[in-house]
Amino acid sequence: MNAKGKVIKYGNNVDTDVIIPARYLNTSDPAELASHCMEDLDEKFTQRVQKGDVMVAGKNFGCGSSREHAPISIKASGISCVIAETFARIFYRNAVNIGLPIIECSEAAKDIKDNDQVEIDFDKGLIKNLTTGKTYQGQPFPEFMQEIISADGLIQYIKNSLS
């Protein structure tokens, strides 16, 4: 599994309340959630995000309230992957469960700049900054977790396993 796109970068401690504000939790429609993704942190996010873009952030990405709405809004906005120094554990699990590819790599998250072009090889955990030519080694998921993400999330993975 691979991803390639332009970087949209954020800092440390980006919490689920700014990823998708609580006032929008009354819907589970991915398109509606995407239209409000990051709006309290970055008013222009929905205007500048393109399908395939890669979100890069610092430490503790997705901290705060446990809500699947956060990774759903990111995925539905067109983001193909999130790279961070670290993820809050509940966000990490929710991202896998809904099929949003994520990867931890402190060095990449620190070095990569907004608007850089990056390519991610999830099987190897490799992140290549196509703008600078630098390559980083991230932590790849175990095979079974990659299968869940590739299946578009845990529910579809289970459905596929039962059929």
From Swiss-Prot:
Catalytic activity, reaction form: (2R,3S)-3-isopropylmalate = (2S)-2-isopropylmalate
Keywords of this entry: Amino-acid biosynthesis, Branched-chain amino acid biosynthesis, Leucine biosynthesis, Lyase
Assembly behavior: Heterodimer of LeuC and LeuD.
UniProt name for this protein: 3-isopropylmalate dehydratase small subunit
Highest classification ranks of the organism: Bacteria, Bacillati, Bacillota, Clostridia, Eubacteriales
Record function comment: Catalyzes the isomerization between 2-isopropylmalate and 3-isopropylmalate, via the formation of 2-isopropylmaleate.
Enzyme class: lyase
GO BP term (any one): L-leucine biosynthetic process
Gene3D superfamilies (alphabetical): Aconitase, domain 4
NCBIfam families xrefs: leud, LEUD_arch
Gene that this polypeptide is encoded by: leuD
